Amino acid sequence: LQLILKLVTPMKEMNIDKIPMVRVTWLDARDMETGWLPIKDIVNAPLAVCQEVGYLVVNNDDKIVIMRSWCVDKEDNHGGGSIAIPRGWVRKIEYLKVEYATR
């Protein structure tokens, strides 16, 4: 019951200035081309090396969640472009520094 309540309880408003910006490198599945292939090519199939950049909104033992977009309207409290990556797939998390452009 506590787990269910946690899932349906609205999340507190997120302070985006306290959420780290990151670049994450992870391994992902790679689909092989269709048709007949030499067995050695199938056995040696590489994994895809992927990267994502965004806000690191979840970082625990099971997964990380990256959110690319954030609505700055305080009444909206929505994010977009998110991806959940199993923790075991993650190879590297690089923390990025946010700098503001000057005119």
Name every feature range the model reports, one short phrase each.
Residues 1-10:
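N-terminal amphipathic/basic-hydrophobic helices that include classical n-h-c signal peptides
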Residues 10-103:
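Conserved RNA-binding domains used in RNP assembly and mRNA/RNA metabolism
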